[in-house]
């Protein structure tokens, strides 16, 4: 027969059973804060007939419970960006989660092998591949430890420290590396490769910048919500409890792709001088005349001075203050009560209200002020981030505002603003190495900063690039000393401290799993092998005597 026979009744029964299972799954407490705009039937139809249970979903459950506990206790899961298996194995002793940074991957682990700054222009499998690299290392060290422990007696095991190597991983999904279908595929990759959670930011994909670079271009609020819905839908299709972190770069953004979403209208800049003309047309005309470089920049600068660039509410307030109106303060209050960062008032509504209050059509044109690339000028800020955080909250497990400084007052303003609308919302915070920490606060405040943020609801905090910076510092220091004092640098500043501090990598053969692999060889060869890696003659026997010679 050209086709495979199928029992239609069983097919229908299996579908209805799966729909019921999905509905039951979604009714669990895990999803009490999650909004879905699609049905269980939609998800069941998009699944294959073979059910695959991804271990990363167990890690997601572990992460969710971890953050739930921290939230209840007003404590914090704090971590940093891991570069490699050495990092995750050492971090596991002290930290309860792992971060995988797109910035670090861009500079050190692109699948194209081409280093780059954090522009998310590396292949989209770059960060998922790094997650898998670290996840496989976690699984291996977990197996290795278990085998080692189970060769000991129960009494010996009770005295032997246990390390939870399976710390859940949260990874950087940048802007999603494309449209909705790209985000669905990227999410699938992360699920398959071991991520417990991912974060996605509200920048435009083609112009994405590191959160601490200039020139950031936002997408409209709804477009980013669509990304978050895509992540959840993808996770639902593949049966994962993956956590989604919604990041907003709106605090320092200066451009936006579109004016389509009324929630963004308050923050879009326009020209208030009708004599200024259209900037893009002016620049194009200048270029057609062969004007480039500094002369072209001067034309743009002159236009900017002339245009009277401001937000619409600023233009209205200026009109009232400078015009011939009685009860100016009352007029301004009437306007700002209805038009403010969190009111979601459309420009059309704001313009209508302004005319009712002033009797004038106040000139304001955001089209003529567009940048040469076609983007609209945008003035973000903390309240803009609050607006976006509130909008993203129903579709994300955590909300993160990227900020320019480690400013506690600003962090509190954001937390209070989001939680005023969503009281139980979890928050995330980037303890960025781009901040000058010693300039920002004294050492005693640095020590308490994580805890203080934790009290505000920032349950997950991370130093994005600590893996990069600590590695650079250690290698720079060792290379310098090695160049001057040879093997004394290794013996005295690396190996001896490893021994004294009990860093297990000093016995790197054992750490890498040689004893575990010997056990596998013996198991499949009847208990005897002459090719055991850790047999007689292995040089690590030297470390049984760990005292350094004078």
From Swiss-Prot:
Substrate binds at residues 101-103, 211-212, 247, 430-434, 464. Its main location: other. Pathway: Carbohydrate metabolism; glyoxylate cycle; (S)-malate from isocitrate: step 1/2. GO terms for cellular component: glyoxysome. The active site is at 210 (proton acceptor). The keyword Kinase does not apply. PROSITE patterns: ISOCITRATE_LYASE. It catalyses: D-threo-isocitrate = glyoxylate + succinate; (2S,3R)-3-hydroxybutane-1,2,3-tricarboxylate = pyruvate + succinate. One of its GO terms (molecular function) is isocitrate lyase activity. Mg(2+) binds at residue 172. A motif (Microbody targeting signal) lies at residues 548-550. Pfam families: ICL. Keywords: Glyoxylate bypass, Glyoxysome, Lyase, Magnesium, Metal-binding, Peroxisome, Tricarboxylic acid cycle. InterPro entries: ICL/PEPM (IPR039556), Isocitrate_lyase (IPR006254), Isocitrate_lyase_ph_CS (IPR018523), Pyrv/PenolPyrv_kinase-like_dom (IPR015813), Pyrv_kinase-like_dom_sf (IPR040442). This is Isocitrate lyase.
